[in-house]
Regions:
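Short, extreme N-terminal leader segments that mark the start of a protein/domain
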Residues: 1-54
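Aromatic- and glycine-enriched beta-alpha-beta binding-site module
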Residues: 49-117
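Short linear motifs in intrinsically disordered
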Residues: 26-31, 75-77, 151-156
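Short, basic/low-complexity N-terminal boundary segments at the transition from targeting/disordered tails
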Residues: 14-18, 59-62, 67, 140-146
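Short beta-strand-initiation
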Residues: 33-35, 74, 81, 159
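Short, glycine-/Ser/Thr-/acidic-enriched flexible segments
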Residues: 43-45, 79, 179
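A contiguous, surface-oriented mixed alpha/beta subdomain in the mid-to-C-terminal portion of proteins
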Residues: 86, 91-195
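Detector for glycine-centered tight turns/loop "hinges" at secondary-structure junctions
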Residues: 45-47, 68, 169
Length: 195
């Protein structure tokens, strides 16, 4: 289906301009925490996951400007993988399918940019690089899931609400997330912390 597809690398993160939080892998914490608050959410199955907060309101990303430029030194891998994503698929639980956002403006059949497949139908370097990035990203997601499960098991997370007063005087309250309790972390036995 996509054998004749070409991709132009377009600068810009317009696709994320209304995204107020993004998944962040544990391996990214050190770099991401310099620019974004990192908090934890829970899915309907009570699985804990980390996110970088990008906005104070729904559909607000304070890091993407009107031209689609990301105004931060570090861009989360979740955004950098676009327009490619992995979707669970197949009989195996750990089997994933590489998917694309067909609405991405850089995709075309006019042979502009780089082909995703060569004349023999094999993946080109550009697609191989995207697939390698996705595989690496998914490995980090799995490690992050284990890390977050440990945080929950050690009861280190607590609900938090952030109360913010804007320079205009407007007051905002952001809740529905968790953070690591400093008191519980300090009280943790050294052996448990090493786990």
């Amino acid at each position: 289906q996509h054998s004749k597809l070409y991709m132009e690398s377009l600068e810009g993160f317009d696709f994320a301009n209304e995204t107020n939080s993004l998944y962040i892998a544990a391996v990214e914490f050190a770099q991401a925490a310099r620019e974004y608050p990192i908090v934890f959410g829970k899915d309907p199955q009570d699985v804990v996951f980390p996110v970088a907060l990008l906005g104070l309101r729904p559909n607000q990303n304070l890091y993407v400007d009107k031209e689609g430029k990301w105004n931060a030194s570090y861009i989360p891998a979740y955004a950098r993988r676009y327009p490619f994503i992995l979707a669970k698929g197949g009989a195996e639980e750990e089997q994933f399918t590489v998917c694309i956002d067909e609405g991405y403006k850089g995709f075309n059949t006019a042979k502009e940019g780089q082909a995703l497949f060569d004349k023999k139908g094999e993946q080109t370097d550009v697609l191989n690089q995207a697939v390698d990035f996705l595989k690496d990203y998914q490995n980090h997601v799995q490690l992050t899931t284990l890390f977050c499960a440990n945080l929950a098991e050690l009861d280190l997370l607590e609900p938090m609400t952030a109360n913010i007063e804007m320079t205009s005087g407007e007051k905002l309250s952001i809740g529905g997330f968790q953070c690591v309790s400093r008191e519980k972390l300090k009280a943790l036995k050294p052996g448990k912390l090493a786990d």
